[in-house]
């Protein structure tokens, strides 16, 4: 660069002479060419081709490999110190003073406290009133009584585990059998309860039947009003289970805990009579008393009457309606105490009459045979 500046200065100074300037221009061009060639050729010449040892590059792996021996030594020393401390505690009948342990092991007190904190956290040692005194509490049994108690507790635990497994297995079998019984098509026609069943089970308790609702409400001796509604606002069918359509009062209840008015509960056997009875209440779910009030939607009067008529028609025309069977409402048990309907045909017996040994076709069809 310095030669190029000199050449440019020479060029401005020799601008007046024509021949000299042309000669100088040739020299400048030759000088620039030589400078360029030297600049290009100077790079490989100035390089040092002697082989030098490569500079080591520090990497995280190298640093970790260099620090691992130190860490291993520290961890190994900590483990070794812990083993020595545990042996020292066991040698002193399970208790030792940390100050004495520090002097015996010839380590810093901080190292001893680190070990004791970890051992206390996992429940192997226990510190007494004084923090410097520790007592060994785990890792073995000090006497035969502890071993005996352990064996007894272990055997009892195993016995209880066996009982639990047996109960779980029986419960699984019971649930499976119940599921099979409920899924059997022949048993679905008997999946119901009658009014007599509810009265026998609950006795004098007041029972309201609500479809698809399983909840028990305890009504105490206070003024309560029971109101039941659906989230979608549709009508709901609620019946009060009573004896022969009339509510009963507990004779032992002197305060008149349940004093209900007359309530006609439609049933498959009495729906025809209740529909013709003019004294029946307008809403079959209304119960109004002094202590308890129960209300239903007044607009369901027509719907209830329609349901009663449909049920009555199903009972009367059961032989003409396809897909309907009275067994959905009452089982075929002739030994019921108060059967709703008397079954006339077919009879209970397989055969009302039988032929004797000396009778034949004539006696069967009551025909005069010659």
Swiss-Prot record:
Tell me the compartments it is located in. Nucleus
Q: Name one GO biological process term.
A: negative regulation of G1/S transition of mitotic cell cycle
Cross-referenced SMART domains:
E2F_TDP
Instruction: Write out the biased-composition intervals (Low complexity).
Output: 15-26, 59-73
Q: InterPro entries this protein is in?
A: E2F, E2F-DP_heterodim, E2F_WHTH_DNA-bd_dom, WH-like_DNA-bd_sf, WH_DNA-bd_sf
Which N-terminal stretch is annotated as signal sequence?
none
User: Could you tell me the superkingdom of the organism this chain comes from?
Assistant: Eukaryota
Tell me the DNA-binding residue spans: 72-137
- Phenotypic consequence of gene deletion: Flies show reduced viability, with between 20 to 35% surviving until adult stages and both male and female flies showing significantly reduced fertility. E2f1 and E2f2 double mutants die at the pupal stage during development compared with E2f1 mutants that die earlier at the larval stage, indicating that E2f1 and E2f2 functionally antagonize each other in vivo. According to PubMed:11748144, flies are viable, with males that are fully fertile and females that are partially sterile.
Q: Which Gene3D superfamilies match?
A: 6.10.250.540, Winged helix-like DNA-binding domain superfamily/Winged helix DNA-binding domain (1.10.10.10)
UniProt lists compositionally biased (Polar residues) regions at 31-49
Region: Disordered, residue numbers: 1-73
Write out the entry's keywords from A to Z. DNA-binding, Nucleus, Repressor, Transcription, Transcription regulation
SUPFAM superfamilies for this protein: E2F-DP heterodimerization region, Winged helix' DNA-binding domain
Q: Which GO terms describe its cellular component?
A: chromatin; DRM complex; Myb complex; nucleus; Rb-E2F complex; RNA polymerase II transcription regulator complex
Q: Which Pfam families match?
A: E2F_TDP (PF02319)
Instruction: Cite the GO molecular-function annotations of the record.
Output: DNA-binding transcription factor activity, RNA polymerase II-specific; RNA polymerase II cis-regulatory region sequence-specific DNA binding; RNA polymerase II transcription regulatory region sequence-specific DNA binding
Region: Dimerization, residue numbers: 137-226
Tissue expression, per UniProt?
Ubiquitously expressed in eye disk.
User: How does this polypeptide assemble, per the annotation?
Assistant: Forms a heterodimer with Dp. Interacts with Rbf/Rbf1 and Rbf2. Component of the DREAM complex, which is at least composed of Myb, Caf1-55, mip40, mip120, mip130, E2f2, Dp, Rbf, Rbf2, lin-52, HDAC1/Rpd3 and l(3)mbt.
UniProt function note: Transcriptional repressor that binds to E2f sites and represses E2f-regulated target genes. Binding to E2f sites requires transcription factor Dp. Acts synergistically with Rbf2 to antagonize E2f1-mediated transcriptional activation. Component of the DREAM complex, a multiprotein complex that can both act as a transcription activator or repressor depending on the context. The DREAM complex is required for recruiting E2f2 at differentiation-specific promoters and for stabilizing E2f2-Rbf complexes during S phase.
Record family assignment: Belongs to the E2F/DP family.
State the name under which the record lists this protein.
Transcription factor E2F2
Q: Which organism is it from?
A: Drosophila melanogaster (Fruit fly)
* Classification lineage: Eukaryota, Metazoa, Ecdysozoa, Arthropoda, Hexapoda
What's the name of its gene?
Answer: E2f2
